[in-house]
Regions:
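Short glycine-rich phosphate-binding loop at a beta-alpha junction
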Residues: 41-52, 62, 185-194
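Conserved phosphate-binding catalytic cores of ATP/NTP-utilizing and phosphoryl-transfer enzymes
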Residues: 1-2, 70-101, 217-226
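A short, well-structured beta->alpha microelement
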Residues: 21-40
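Gly/Thr-rich phosphate-binding beta-strand-loop-beta motif of the actin/hexokinase/Hsp70
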Residues: 1-25, 98-121, 137
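Conserved phosphate-binding/catalytic loops in two-lobed NTP-binding clefts
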Residues: 60-72, 203-221
């Protein structure tokens, strides 16, 4: 770990930070219009981006791009966040059975990325994420409003409109993951802002799920330090 080196991932809706607090890192998020967090020096900031860049003086030479990530069969058009997540999953996951890795990044979108035990990208899927689905219903319908709280009901069929929206969206995301995940052949790793919410629901039915919310940020640190 190098003194005063911090990390930033510019997401689609938020800024994701890893602040160097030796010997560990502090992971947190801010809105794009917020000021730079205290103790973050932009000159020593390693960054990557999948969203619109904020009005910050980010140094081009400090940028990590998809082309910088050494993975087999990695297309240049893949998001750098997906590439970094794959890189870190390969590093941290114990995989003696040589299963394939399925990474579910639960953010603005739910992106699924599958790779072999040897680190070769197979491909993936992308669908609207938890909040994106809720907000799209509010935007494109007359009478639906996005819930302010995200307590997923246990029942399958609800009377309350907000509960019905929450259950429908959570089921849609779990359905995408369940249809793509074969526990006999795959290891499922969940990351991103909504990974603990969706992952906890999946874990009620399947035990062999790894939830690592900061997988991508840890991947940035790993890439830089190696």
């Amino acid at each position: 770990m190098i003194d005063d080196i911090n990390f930033l991932l510019v997401g689609n809706s938020r800024l994701h930070w890893a602040e160097n607090l030796q010997p560990k890192y502090k992971f947190f998020h801010t809105q794009k219009n917020n000021n730079v967090p205290q103790n973050i020096n932009l000159n020593n900031l390693i960054w990557a981006s999948v969203g619109k860049l904020p009005d910050l003086s980010l140094k081009k030479e400090n940028r990590i791009s998809t082309q910088d990530i050494k993975l087999k069969n990695l297309p240049n058009h893949f998001g750098v966040d997906r590439a970094l997540g794959c890189l870190e999953a390969l590093r941290i996951i114990e995989n003696p059975s040589r299963k394939e890795l399925l990474i579910a990044d639960c953010g603005t979108t739910l992106s699924l990325t599958k790779l072999t035990a040897q680190g070769s990208i197979i491909g993936g899927q992308i669908t609207p994420g938890f909040l994106t689905q809720l907000r799209s219903m509010e935007k494109y319908t007359k009478n639906l409003e996005a819930p302010k709280k995200y307590d997923i009901p246990l029942q399958d069929f609800l009377i309350n409109t907000e509960d019905s929206m929450l259950k429908g969206v959570s089921n849609s995301l779990m359905g995408v993951i369940n249809l793509s995940f074969n526990p006999t052949k795959d290891i499922l790793i969940m990351c991103g802002g909504d990974s603990e919410l969706i992952g906890s629901l999946l874990k009620q039915k399947k035990e062999e799920i790894i939830i690592a919310p900061n997988l991508v940020m840890q991947g940035m640190i790993t890439h830089f330090n190696h």
